[in-house]
Amino acid sequence: MDSTYLLVALLCLLGLAIRTRYELLKKAGRVDTKNRVVFAVVFAAMCVMLLSWPVMCPRDPWRVAVPGVARWTGLVMVVAALVLAFGGLLQLRGLEDIDHLVTTGLFSKLRHPMYTGFILWIAGWVVCHGAIASLVPAALCIGNILYWRRLEEDALESQFAEEYRRYRRGTWF
């Protein structure tokens, strides 16, 4: 097995663990979300996790041949992921402590365009490269992203109450 693949897979999972730990500490009220050092560490962890996929999947030890249409589908997923993730980030104009409920633009259709983008990014790289071994870290990452979404929805419902419940009923994911 390619040692680069193992190293990058471990870095991916480390980034995932750091972000998940942050979310748990945030839920418990045990982390200062305005602390720039904390933000930098979590942001770097997310970058490592997300940037590991274009390195990891081409080196996957259990790759299978992917038909052209599947490869292109994976690439379209990656491009859509970038549009959703960066579009959501630009629209939010921040990542933490946003004092109002954003319900326009991408957020008028998707409650979590950035999380949707992360999921498409991961799945797109796996599909594009037929990366069978990478399905394990992909499942862990996507499962955690869905968990982060749940934590975020609980926090938004606590903060915005009925306004958020109405918004949630009218949008997907």
Regions of interest found by a model, annotated:
Residues 1-100, 120-173:
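Membrane-anchoring alpha-helices and their flanking helix-loop junctions
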